Amino acid sequence: MDYKTILNQSSDLLKNFSIKSARLDSELLLSSSLKISRENLLLNLNKEIKPNQQKKFKSLLEKRTKKVPVAYILGYKDFWKSKFLISRSVLIPRPDTELIVEEALNYLPKDKYKKILDIGTGSGSILIS
């Protein structure tokens, strides 16, 4: 089975579980299973998936059908310009939180050292970004 076929099938499956980001989630989980970037995955949709890779992908996909967030499945989340390790003990950084980082950087002087107190940082994504 090629990458395109398995992506289409998995995306349809996730849609049946009312997962709105079905295609994106499928791409992220498959690229992780293949140990390649999402970009590389999308550039090689005609490539065949190996049985061990397909088994790994099915395992990740099953977790997603149980509504486990992709960041918890993969153990990381891209936020701002970095990749953050994520576990169930921290909140997942949200895309709209990146606006807070942007606004803070616009507000703070660019040429001065910044001191910020962040209590209960969780993943630390806001503070580090």
Language model region names:
Residues 7, 26-27, 57, 67-70, ...:
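A general structural signal for well-ordered alpha-helical segments in protein cores
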Residues 98-129:
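Conserved SAM/SAH cofactor-binding pocket of Class I
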Residues 1-53, 57:
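A short N-terminal interaction module
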Residues 32-107:
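Conserved AdoMet
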Residues 27, 59, 73, 114-116:
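A residue-level detector for conformationally permissive "hinge/kink" positions
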